[in-house]
A protein has these predicted regions:
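Aromatic-enriched hydrophobic runs in primary sequence
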Residues: 1-2, 10-16, 29, 50-61, ...
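Aromatic- and carboxylate-lined catalytic core of secreted/periplasmic carbohydrate-active enzymes
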Residues: 222-350, 356-373
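Aromatic-residue hotspot detector
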Residues: 16, 80, 353, 359-360
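A sequence-composition feature that detects small, non-aromatic residues
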Residues: 3, 9, 15, 24, ...
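Active-site mouth of glycoside hydrolases
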Residues: 1-186, 190-197
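Extracellular glycoside hydrolase catalytic/binding regions
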Residues: 115, 120-123, 134-290
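Generic marker of "main functional regions" within proteins
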Residues: 50, 66-68, 142, 150-152, ...
């Protein structure tokens, strides 16, 4: 705890306004959970505007679960803790630390039947929507590190649905939670309509099967990792996860930010995923990729193919050797794409193709772009 309120900016700004009343644990005045911090939301709006100019999305995590699980130091300063706000939140005081530093407050925090917390949660979720409603490049997610219960995930989506009905607006909403909760929501014909993006972040396939913590067990992702073997992952496992959900729910985008995701950008791309971590050194190829869809290949195939007869095809080859594919009749340019640097090199300037085409692979893990002329 701070000795006093003698602090220098910049502060760790929160979404809620200070009241000028009382003294919170950090030595400053208490928060009002019903009033937005205008400076905080102004900065997020400014970030979204600057990002839009560069084609960058803002993923707005409404909550941060780390405040209520694991590190007690985050909870002591959290606006939702009773001593830090004027709203009478009824969490236990003094803080029930485990081993003098760990905190397990998720069960109480996610209690939507709590008459004090429920309206505060609803008002805050609506605040997140209201304050970013004019920004088309903002994606709303429930919480960073979220392993919370299904009932709170439903509550969050129901609140968004109510807001959408009242305002006529539809922000981009990503469903980012454990697999069991994700599958339950996607099976709900009404709540699934609210979801635009399926975000695979808190589960993954590994070489022996599936790593998927259960929702609502009052444990953070890192704590689950200590209890359950994470296992080894690779291109095939990332590809299969994305392709499975793109196939089941073709009207929704799928993002993948799970185990070791930066390594699997090409797997995500070839499976039809969005926001893959790939370098592409050609604006034309980037544009054409947005028009392509699945053609052939599975996670363990020698090659995966995506394409569109109108613009061409992209082939990801895992090894050396010939790759034969069916293509629309026409003239094409064949390029090789370095999957690490993104450098695009032309292999053949003009090829007239009728029906099938064979690429002679010269290296492992190489992408080929068959550009329609």
């Amino acid at each position: 705890r701070r000795a006093d309120g003698d602090v220098w900016a910049p502060f760790y700004e929160q979404a809620f306004s200070r009241t000028g009343q009382g003294t919170a644990w950090d030595g400053l005045s208490c928060y009002d959970l019903t009033k937005p911090n205008q400076w905080y939301w102004m900065r997020l709006n400014e970030f979204a505007e600057k990002g839009a100019e560069k084609g960058i999305l803002l993923f707005n995590q409404n909550y941060f679960q780390h405040n209520i699980l694991e590190a007690g130091a985050h909870w002591v300063d959290c606006p939702w803790r009773p001593v830090n706000n004027v709203n009478g939140t009824n969490f236990p005081e003094p803080v029930p630390f485990t081993g003098d530093k760990r905190i397990f407050m998720a069960e109480q925090f996610y209690d939507i039947n709590n008459p004090i917390l429920r309206p505060l949660h609803k008002q805050y979720i609506r605040q997140c929507l209201d304050n970013l409603k004019d920004k088309g490049n903002v994606v709303q997610l429930l919480s960073e590190e979220y392993t919370g219960p299904l009932h709170f995930t439903r509550f969050w989506l129901e609140t968004i649905a109510e807001w959408e009905k009242e305002t006529g607006l539809h922000p981009m909403v990503a469903l980012s939670c454990t697999k069991d909760a994700q599958d339950a929501i996607l099976a709900d014909p009404e709540l699934s309509k609210v979801v635009d993006i399926i975000d695979i972040r808190y589960w993954h396939y590994n070489t022996k099967g599936l790593w998927a913590p259960e929702a609502g067990k009052n444990l953070a992702p890192r704590q689950f990792m200590r209890k359950m073997k994470v296992g080894k992952t690779g291109f095939a496992e990332a590809y299969n996860a994305v392709k499975e959900y793109r196939t089941k729910y073709p009207e929704k985008a799928v993002t993948f930010f799970s185990q070791q995701y930066p390594q699997y950008g090409w797997a995500i791309l070839m499976a039809g995923g969005s926001c893959p971590n790939v370098a592409i050194g050609s604006d034309k190829l980037l544009t054409d990729l947005t028009k392509m869809s699945y053609i052939s290949g599975e996670g363990n195939s020698a090659a995966q193919v995506i394409g569109n007869p109108a613009v061409g095809y992209v082939i990801y080859a895992h090894g050396e050797g010939d790759i034969t594919l069916n293509v629309e009749n026409g003239k094409y340019t064949l390029h090789a794409v370095d999957t690490k640097s993104g450098v695009v090199k032309t292999v053949k300037k003009s090829e007239k193709i009728s029906g099938t085409y064979t690429i002679s692979g010269k290296a492992k893990d190489t992408a080929y772009w068959l550009e329609r002329l």
